[in-house]
């Protein structure tokens, strides 16, 4: 499990676009804590403080202790909205987590390792990542930083499916009916075709 991060916030009673804009002018980020069966809790935090946490590795899979006035909440980041130009954090949603031992759905990053030893990449292939995160059900006290995927023995043209991932004890994939592809090693010609398709689309958009 990741080391728990800490963050200080405040309850807020004014909602809506104008209120959110006023908070942002003060350097604060409006946010909401969600949990099934409870009324959403509206909070705000200092943008510079939550932005520091956002830049840390494995932010999405790290439990945060959020101190709001005289209350403490254990939360997981759910969604972050950034300004499209300034990348200022406009809004953040949290999920309230239960005590240790309870199960929690969490989005965990996939770390593709062994690229320097990959047979396919050594032969001129290119790692095409389809999924960078996987949805898991994990005990709150055993949420992994990431799920490692070794691609050392993956050859050109081979696909890596979700079933290949080795999950920590107690963690399970959120139910899925398909064994979907999370990455593949494509050859030079396939890579070139993708780049040419992208260039053609860019040219069409500019007309």
Curated annotation (Swiss-Prot):
Keyword Ribonucleoprotein: yes
Entry's Gene Ontology BP terms: translation
InterPro entries (UniProt xref): Rbsml_bL25/Gln-tRNA_synth_N (IPR020056), Ribosomal_bL25/Gln-tRNA_synth (IPR011035), Ribosomal_bL25_b-dom (IPR020057), Ribosomal_bL25_C (IPR037121), Ribosomal_bL25_long (IPR001021), Ribosomal_L25_dom (IPR029751), Ribosomal_uL5_bac-type (IPR020930)
SUPFAM superfamilies documented for this protein: Ribosomal protein L25-like
UniProt keyword list: Ribonucleoprotein, Ribosomal protein, RNA-binding, rRNA-binding
One protein family per Pfam: Ribosomal_TL5_C
GO cellular component terms listed in the entry, alphabetical order: cytosolic large ribosomal subunit
Protein origin, superkingdom: Bacteria
The UniProt record lists the keyword Transmembrane: no
GO molecular function (one): structural constituent of ribosome
CDD domains given in the database record: Ribosomal_L25_TL5_CTC (cd00495)
Subunit structure: Part of the 50S ribosomal subunit; part of the 5S rRNA/L5/L18/L25 subcomplex. Contacts the 5S rRNA. Binds to the 5S rRNA independently of L5 and L18.
Family: Belongs to the bacterial ribosomal protein bL25 family. CTC subfamily.
Role: This is one of the proteins that binds to the 5S RNA in the ribosome where it forms part of the central protuberance.
UniProt-recorded name of the protein: Large ribosomal subunit protein bL25
Organism of origin: Orientia tsutsugamushi (strain Boryong)
């Amino acid at each position: 499990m990741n080391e728990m991060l800490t963050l200080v916030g405040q309850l807020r009673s004014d909602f809506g676009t104008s209120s959110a804009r006023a908070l942002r002018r003060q350097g604060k980020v409006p946010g909401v804590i969600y949990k099934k069966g409870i009324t959403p809790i509206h909070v705000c935090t200092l943008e510079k403080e939550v932005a520091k946490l956002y830049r840390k590795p494995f932010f999405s899979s790290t439990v945060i202790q959020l101190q709001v006035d005289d209350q403490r909440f254990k939360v997981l980041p759910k969604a972050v909205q950034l300004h499209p130009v300034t990348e200022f954090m406009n809004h953040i949603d949290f999920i309230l987590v239960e005590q240790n031992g309870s199960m929690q759905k969490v989005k965990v990053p996939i770390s593709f390792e062994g690229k320097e030893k990959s047979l396919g990449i050594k032969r001129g292939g290119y790692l095409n990542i389809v999924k960078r995160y996987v949805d898991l059900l994990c005990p709150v006290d055993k949420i992994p930083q990431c799920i490692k995927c070794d691609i050392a023995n993956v050859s050109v043209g081979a696909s890596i499916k979700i079933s290949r991932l080795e999950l920590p004890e107690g963690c399970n994939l959120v139910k899925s009916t398909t064994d979907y592809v999370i990455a593949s090693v494509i050859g030079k010609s396939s890579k070139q075709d993708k780049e040419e398709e992208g260039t053609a689309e860019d040219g069409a958009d500019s007309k």
